[in-house]
Amino acid sequence: MTGVPQIEIETVNEEDVSRRSFLQTGGACFAGGLLLPRFLNEQLAVKELQAGDSDRMWGVAMAYGGGRLDLIDLDNAKLLHSFEGIRATHAITPIEALNRFVIHGHRADSKDGAVVVFQVDPVKKTWEVILNKELPGGPALHWQPNPEFTEIVFNTVGDGSLHVLDTKDLTIKRYDGGGQHSNMAFFKNYLVATDKMSGPTHLNVVDRNTGKMVAKTAVGHWGHGVTVNHERGEAFVWASEGVHVVSLAQKTMGKHLRLLVTENLDERCWFCWTPQGGRYSHDVSWNPGDEYRPYLLVTDMQKGRFEKIPTGDPKLQPSYLQLSPDGKWGLASLRGLEDIAIFDTVANKFEGVVKAGPARASFFERDMTFCRKRDCALVTNTGDNTISLLDLKQKQEIRRISLPRRPLWLKVISPA
């Protein structure tokens, strides 16, 4: 951002803030056990990159970094509130239909897991903590929503439990049958989960009616990403040997059906699934020995084969991948570059790149999130502590906002 005027952060004097307003917005946080350091309302440094941005309704974003959650008013580039007391792990999940953010991880003063849910209004810029729940059994690391985002399953790594959150009524039910760092999926009234990430791996199937495990299937070594084809009733597990396919049909539950062998074995990959259940993509995780290539690999779960979406340039190597909630679009960080790749994941087509900010080379380079209409997106720039607002149709960065610290996870809820 060379040559960009630096804007000092302006902090509202707390004595000028209505005490009644402070209690109305902050009371739920104190009651729930989260620490609210102060009423912030800070003006953030912002770089305008294109005219006409003032008419766009961006809504609110939740960012995590440095042990702190920040709620950001994107329209006015203001930091609405900052929350401490929970250590988020791996992600923030937006529930667009309910205007809610779900954060999982563990409390700063506890080794047990925790789930916190924020109710927000993306137009009025109001918020409320409506759930702050402890999950016994160790930190909650991995998570997976169902295709409708009405439920999310979390895995507590200490005892291997599976915890299912109803995103509407906020009830949580616990099940046995997970493991250490489980990767999970929903299928009808079953939970599907791996038992670990390294070494020999099994896929467990848990009946939610009885709470009992009904199948346990060996799925090779380093069984990692898991997804389900709901139409065919099959689970797909990416492992070092390739993709293991396991039956979820009633009569053949747990039967190992076949192995889809990839070109590049021993690469440990994460899955991004589509709600339609017909196909899904994967990206290469940042592990020693893994290589990056100038294409995105997609598994057609109907035909049982792999398809490549080439970027057309050997320098454009997708790494961290994010799919839109409707499964129609994909964004990928490009290793070593400030560009973001855009993919049409329905037509399996590379749509080009849009320039953002710098990213640090790490296990998770940056996070990405789509606005509700899918015509815009936000990405974290971990190299300069900023977030970029991108116009995906024009393939342009139109705003960059500087944050007080390095953002790791980021999600947005925009007006309907």
Regions inferred by a protein language model and the residue ranges of each:
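N-terminal secretory signal peptides
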Residues: 1-21
